[in-house]
Amino acid sequence: MFNKRAFEMVSNEQIKKSFGERYDYSNPDFRGGFKIRFSPRRATKYSAAYDLYSPIEVVLKPGEIAKIPTGFKIKMPHNEGFFIYIRSSLGTKDINLPAGVNIIDSDYYDNPDNEGHFFIAIKNNSEKEFKIEQGDRIAQGVFQRYYTCGDKPISIRMGGFGSSGK
């Protein structure tokens, strides 16, 4: 069991696989700059949530859903999850998370499919095009402890986004 929580960048290979041509890798120290600009972080000393940033520009047409790669994976204790919510400022513009909340389980970390690289699915429910700029805060995440009722797990995670239960 992990005792500490941490946001870690996924490998260069995973970043290139997830971002493709949507990110500029020309800077030899792109990892350092990426980490400084887009690492999840709390805005104030007592903020409960970590702000989550879009490393890429995305234009969402009305009704469109985009899966935005973050470039990060999350290490956390096995009795916790990382719960992702839309920023309230986006909710007032009719932009939301299709599932209401995205939940990252602790066993998502380092999964063989995508190293635990977490994405944020966002939907434009408005009737207008909506643009997310590179560096915009798009969501916020909270570490939350959970409890089980003693049931036995039926499988071990082997995949990435949307893989549990398959």
Residues covered by each model-derived region:
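DUTPase catalytic domain/fold
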Residues: 1-166
